[in-house]
Amino acid sequence: MAKQAAIEQDGTIIEALSNAMFRVELENGHVVTAHISGKMRMHYIKLLPGDKVKLEMSPYDLTKARITYRY
């Protein structure tokens, strides 16, 4: 069985949690918990509440996401 593709969404960071986790509100109003991708960690990209970001979500668990880009 092939792995399903990730779902890409845009959102806004609401709150910074511990361990580089963030609470993000999607454009459709849903709130998810997201962590920073490895490349963003490697390049020391800082995120603050209010930043617009691009997220990747697994089709299996729509409450968790990975932040892949900051606008």
Swiss-Prot record:
Component of the 30S ribosomal translation pre-initiation complex which assembles on the 30S ribosome in the order IF-2 and IF-3, IF-1 and N-formylmethionyl-tRNA(fMet); mRNA recruitment can occur at any time during PIC assembly. Belongs to the IF-1 family. Transmembrane segments: none annotated. One of its GO terms (molecular function) is translation initiation factor activity. Its main location: cytoplasm. It is found in: Cytoplasm. InterPro entries: NA-bd_OB-fold (IPR012340), RNA-binding_domain_S1_IF1 (IPR006196), TIF_IF1 (IPR004368). This is Translation initiation factor IF-1. PROSITE patterns: S1_IF1_TYPE (PS50832). It comes from Christiangramia forsetii (strain DSM 17595 / CGMCC 1.15422 / KT0803) (Gramella forsetii). CDD domains: S1_IF1. Residues 1-71 form the S1-like domain. The keyword Protein biosynthesis applies.
